[in-house]
Amino acid sequence: MKTKLLFLLGLCCLNISAQTINLQSFATGFSSPVEITCAPNDTRLFVVQQSGLIRILNPNGTINTTPFLTLTSSTILSGGERGLLGLAFHPNYATNGYFYVNYTRAGDGATVIARYSVSADPNIADASSGTVLLTVAQPFSNHNGGSIKFGPDGYLYIGMGDGGSGGDPGNRAQNINENLGKMLRIDVNSASPYGIPATNPYVGISGNDEIWAIGLRNPWKFSFNRLNGDLWIADVGQNAIEEINKVSTPATNTGLNFGWRCYEGNVPYDNSGCPSYSATYAPIAVYVHGTTNRCSITGGYFYTGSTYPNFANKYFFADYCTGEIGWVSSDGTITWNYNGPNLITTFGEDTNGELYVAMGGTIYKMIDASLSVNDFGNKGLQLYPNPVQNELVVKNDNNLLLISVTITDLTGKIVLTQGLDALADNRISVASLAKGIYLATVDGPNGRLFQTKLVKE
């Protein structure tokens, strides 16, 4: 009966669509990247390598030679699911220079949340500035969580796995006196080493004060929607179901129970002495392993950028084992769209809300493969000829205010930028470009108007 139920669950809310997601190589040369993030209002990306390095990836796709931060084997224990796993910049990083890391400690593998500071050089952190805020013992080597993020409430959220092994043998995720299997929330501003938000659910009563929610197995990746503050948590399943949780107004919507180990996704797992399913917080979407090779969710982001209108109102994620990328729509429907050759370890989001993924040692931009020259017509713009040999025309039928056109190659490198006459038709020489496929972007005073593929013959 359970097998039949899982099969039906896999059919009821999954779609396969013509591929619109594509990945464009942006930078390569990384080793085991596990996090991609940015500081507030900073155009650089910071790439976390599991072995202990944080490297700076510049907007033009170049990588700084000197790492931003290096944590050595005397500080971290790396390998398997352990290592340097998470990075978050303080909301006031531009003025206080604080950033926070999540790593497993050398020796015993305990989870450590520590604060560091940037040095006088904005490209290099002060490696001697480390201050440990929180330590959580880990009984096994797996299910260490990974992501740490500042929420819209200004508090630091910390995703904690259930302590590892399989099936949560200590039932730690449901134990409110343990920090494992939880989403923690701390205030890094009010006290040393940290304070407790007054609205955390167990303040003043039985239960650990740091807990914001219980019942998680291994929330490897979670993120906040920049537009409305919704919290999206991708929780890795045991052996049958992967789940995605969406929490609106997380600042006040506290004390939730996501269900593990009582329930795996929306199906009972080990529910002796457990609350009813209706008393737990149900996921917005699940997908089953079934007869596929899917096995482990890599959470991503709700798209908030402006480059790809087709990505709007979608939360993107991947399956680590198959390399597939999917999205969740507002009604909880999952659509699988991209089937890649490699294992996706993390997504990233830049300051403009555009998305990236890491596969192997390469960082890719996520782009809309369905963009075509016809899309320019939606804005009253025409870009022709396409394919082009020597001269490209940007025709402005609607008298839009134009600023510039930028052409990038498939590695994300800018190969041509030219200012445009604001309200006129424009001609751009592309004779010097090598033959191939490019992306052409037209910007106005408020940012990007549109982007399209361009073929140079």
Mark where each language-model region is:
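Beta-propeller domain segments
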Residues: 82-84, 92-94, 162-334, 356, ...
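Bacterial Sec-dependent N-terminal signal peptides
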Residues: 1-21, 373
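C-terminal outer-membrane/trafficking sorting elements
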Residues: 375-384, 388-457
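Blade-level signature of beta-propeller repeat domains, shared across WD40, Kelch, NHL, RCC1
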Residues: 345-370
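Surface-exposed loop/edge segments in extracytoplasmic proteins
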Residues: 64-66, 333-337, 413-419
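Acidic, Gly/Ser/Thr-rich repeat motifs that build Ca2+-stabilized beta-propeller blades
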Residues: 19-167, 221-224, 229-237, 241, ...
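Short beta-strand-to-coil "C-cap" segments at the C-terminal boundary of structured domains/repeats
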Residues: 118, 186-188, 247-248, 365-371, ...
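Residue-level detector of high-confidence beta-strand sites
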Residues: 132-135, 337, 417, 451
